């Protein structure tokens, strides 16, 4: 069909959301209005009408009946006016061509009026494909019937021509007038055999109708192919072979396209080097297209308008480069396709990219394979030759520092969660040996991750928590099992600490509390080390004084009695009497608590007498 501007528009189906889109002839790249997927238009090559080859000629001659070679030398005579009757097959063929053209135009009009909604449009096109498939079967039966009828007519005409003797020019003119749709001219000297061969060539070179194309598309189980009435059978076979369901998912990681014919094109060495340099320098500008995901409700996008005006965006150029680099004949092999694809993507964390065939039964695990290289490219440094799992395992098992605590090796905390293909122990230890790795180019700056958090594997974390909990339990048990010691309160005695030193062995002794309770002139205390009896006296019940003077006086008295034995007898009872008086227990007055606090009676407590209590 043709639009108002004279451009050919082709209806295609989005390989991702199965939505019917209109594809212009001069727009190579466009965007789906349903899923916002960027698609690449299939390059249209009009197949030239080729002349019949030698193989087709031999094949046509092999299918001829044996009675045909007898009439090869038939010549046209000017004297005889034998008229070749117009074969009924020609008129039937002409009517068939008219009917086919009318049906083709009606089909194209119906396809043009289809709604672009997700549900209704898909159901209507499926119903039309089923109906067109049935009509295509009927047409095939009609074609076979017409071909057999034409063969019989040509054979009969050849037989009648041989019996009559010759064919005139008028026969050829009448036959040519009865077949206006033919593409090959019939010479005046042409025989019925050549005429039949030309008819077969016309049928072979004839462009298939929309019924044939739609029926061929309906036979595809995936339902994601394009609907193109201008495509030749060779291009149909090629498109079926190039369909993503029959290929690996690694060839479709770079960009999402409806055709892969541009993959065969190669970049020059200078262009490839410039592309890689721009990838490393990080000149991607995603802020130019903030509304990338919000451009729905239309079958085309500003990409097509820019192409019409001659404007080529930066991201579009890099998309074409990614397609050329990732082609089956590209300079990069299968190992480097995914790495270059991830580098061509803008260097931004959490880039919003969806899988090419999400929801397709033929690619159930494509999202998993897509997430792993994305986390790998975001978190790990970029290398010229890439880094595989075997290299990481080798570094982990052969590096003595990597098997240790892994000090100084810090990477992002998101890496262990996103990258499910590696376990955290390898990631935690493999980063410590990046500076000494031969894979790292010397001119590349040192890699510093943006998140400063140490990664610890789940096993190590569990062991640490278990050891910490066990240590806490041991400390709690030790505190519980500790023997409870009785609390001993030390009260001050005589205005100070109740501790004295022995006179003979200098051992620290503690004074008992009853020194203040009992009102005596002298208090006796025996040392537990040297068994020496110490005598103390209290002065004003605030100062503790050792009673040594009494011993000196006793010695002097003993010396004086030895000198005068007469005076010795009366002196002894006095000394004994005085010692007995000193050791007499005073009369208890008041409560012991009051005496301990320095009060002898209760009245002193109320009167708050400034006078010290009597002894």
Swiss-Prot record:
Subcellular location: Cell membrane; Endosome
Keywords associated with the record: Cell membrane, Coiled coil, Endocytosis, Endosome, Membrane, Plant defense
UniProt keyword Membrane present: yes
GO BP: defense response; endocytosis; regulation of defense response to fungus; regulation of endocytosis; response to fungus; salicylic acid mediated signaling pathway
Coiled-coil spans in chain: 104-129
Ranges where the record places region Disordered: 46-271, 292-336, 549-592
Domain of life: Eukaryota
Compositionally biased intervals (Low complexity): 159-168
Main localization, broad class: membrane
Tissue specificity: Expressed in stems and rosette leaves, and weakly in inflorescences. Not detected in roots.
Disruption phenotype: Mild, hypersensitive response-like lesions under long-day conditions at late growth stages. Enhanced salicylic acid (SA) accumulation and SA signaling-dependent disease resistance to Golovinomyces cichoracearum UCSC1 associated with enhanced H(2)O(2) accumulation and callose deposition in the infection site as well as higher expression of defense-related genes (PRs). Reduced endocytosis rates.
Binding partners and assembly: Interacts with RLK902. Binds and recruits EDR1 at the powdery mildew (e.g. G.cichoracearum) penetration site on the plasma membrane. Interacts with CHC2.
Cited function: Plays a negative role in salicylic acid (SA)-mediated resistance to powdery mildew (e.g. Golovinomyces cichoracearum). May modulate plant immunity by regulating the relocation of EDR1 by interacting with CHC2 and modulating endocytosis.
Protein name from the UniProt record: Protein ENHANCED DISEASE RESISTANCE 4
Gene: EDR4
């Amino acid at each position: 069909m043709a639009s108002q501007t004279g451009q050919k528009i082709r209806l295609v189906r989005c390989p991702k959301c199965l939505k019917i889109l209109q594809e212009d002839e001069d727009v190579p790249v466009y965007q789906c209005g349903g899923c916002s997927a960027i698609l690449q238009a299939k390059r249209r090559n009009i197949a030239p009408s080729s002349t019949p080859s030698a193989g087709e000629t031999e094949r046509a001659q092999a299918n001829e009946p044996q009675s045909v070679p007898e009439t090869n030398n038939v010549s046209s005579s000017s004297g005889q006016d034998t008229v070749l009757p117009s074969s009924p097959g020609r008129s039937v063929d002409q009517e068939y061509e008219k009917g086919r053209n009318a049906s083709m135009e009606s089909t194209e009009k119906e396809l043009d009026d289809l709604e672009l909604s997700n549900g209704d449009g898909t159901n209507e096109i499926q119903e039309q494909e089923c109906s067109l498939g049935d009509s295509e079967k009927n047409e095939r039966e009609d074609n076979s019937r017409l071909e057999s009828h034409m063969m019989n007519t040509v054979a009969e005409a050849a037989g009648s021509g041989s019996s009559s003797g010759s064919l005139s020019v008028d026969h050829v003119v009448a036959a040519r007038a009865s077949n206006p749709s033919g593409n090959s001219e019939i010479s005046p000297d042409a025989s019925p055999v050549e005429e039949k061969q030309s008819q077969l060539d016309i049928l072979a070179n004839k462009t298939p109708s929309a019924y044939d194309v739609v029926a061929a598309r309906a036979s595809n189980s995936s339902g994601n192919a394009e609907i193109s009435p201008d495509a030749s059978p060779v291009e149909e076979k090629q498109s079926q072979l190039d369909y993503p369901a029959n290929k690996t998912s690694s060839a479709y990681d770079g960009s999402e396209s409806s055709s892969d014919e541009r993959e065969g094109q190669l970049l020059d060495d200078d262009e490839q080097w410039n592309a890689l340099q721009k990838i490393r320098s990080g000149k991607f500008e995603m802020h130019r297209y903030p509304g990338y995901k919000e451009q729905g409700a239309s079958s085309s996008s500003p990409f097509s308008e820019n192409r019409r005006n001659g404007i080529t965006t930066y991201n579009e150029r890099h998309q074409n480069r990614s397609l050329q680099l990732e082609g089956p004949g590209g300079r990069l092999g299968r190992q480097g396709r995914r790495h270059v694809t991830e580098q061509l993507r803008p260097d931004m964390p959490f880039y919003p990219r969806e899988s090419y065939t999400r929801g397709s039964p033929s690619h159930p695990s494509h999202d998993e394979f897509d997430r792993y290289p994305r986390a790998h490219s975001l978190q790990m440094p970029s290398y010229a030759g890439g880094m595989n799992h075997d290299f990481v395992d080798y570094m982990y098992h052969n590096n003595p520092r990597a098997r240790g605590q892994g000090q100084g090796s810090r990477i992002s905390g998101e890496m262990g969660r996103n990258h499910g293909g590696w376990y955290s122990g390898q990631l935690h230890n493999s980063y410590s040996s990046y500076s000494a790795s031969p894979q790292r180019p010397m001119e590349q700056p040192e890699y510093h991750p943006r998140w400063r958090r140490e990664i610890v594997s789940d096993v190590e974390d569990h062991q640490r928590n278990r050891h910490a909990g066990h240590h806490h339990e041991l400390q709690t048990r030790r505190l519980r099992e500790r023997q409870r010691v009785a609390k001993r309160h030390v009260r001050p005695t005589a205005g100070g600490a109740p501790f004295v030193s022995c006179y003979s062995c200098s051992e620290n002794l503690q004074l008992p509390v009853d020194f203040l309770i009992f009102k005596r002139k002298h208090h006796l205390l025996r040392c537990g080390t040297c068994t020496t009896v110490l005598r103390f006296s209290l002065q004003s019940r605030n100062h503790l004084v050792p009673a040594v003077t009494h011993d000196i006086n006793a010695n002097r008295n003993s010396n004086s009695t030895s000198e005068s034995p007469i005076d010795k007898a009366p002196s002894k009872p006095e000394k004994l009497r005085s010692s007995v008086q000193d050791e007499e227990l005073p009369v208890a007055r008041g409560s012991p608590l009051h005496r301990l606090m320095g009060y002898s009676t209760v009245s002193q407590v109320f009167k708050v007498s400034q006078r010290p209590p009597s002894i």
